[in-house]
């Protein structure tokens, strides 16, 4: 996956989460449906669990529900 594709995917994920506390499954379905061909369930999962969550851009509110952090909002501004 190229850097530009990663950035597009991360931006889409953060935009969906910014709309409110969203369930993981809804975020995944919306992202895979609206992004380009490179956005598969596997690439979504890797970006979400291996990058956004561990680096503090997204935080877990309750089981399966996530929200964007201030750090995540800064990243979204940079990507926009």
Give a label for each model feature.
Residues 1-20, 80:
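Short alpha-helical segments that sit at the start of domains
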Residues 6, 63-80:
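Short, cationic-aromatic polyanion-contact patches
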Residues 9, 44, 53-54:
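Short histidine
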Residues 22-33, 38:
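Short acidic, hydrophobic short linear motifs in intrinsically disordered regions
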Residues 24, 60, 68:
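Short beta-strand "wing" residues that participate in macromolecule-binding interfaces
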Residues 38-49:
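Major-groove recognition helix of helix-turn-helix-like DNA-binding domains
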Residues 50-61:
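A short, conserved structural fragment
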């Amino acid at each position: 996956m190229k850097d530009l594709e990663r950035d597009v995917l991360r931006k889409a994920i953060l935009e969906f989460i910014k709309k409110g506390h969203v369930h993981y499954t809804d975020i995944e379905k919306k992202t895979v449906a609206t992004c380009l061909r490179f956005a598969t369930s596997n690439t979504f999962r890797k970006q979400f669990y291996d990058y956004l969550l561990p680096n503090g851009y997204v935080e877990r509110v309750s089981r399966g529900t996530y929200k964007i952090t201030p750090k995540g909002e800064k990243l979204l501004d940079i990507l926009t």
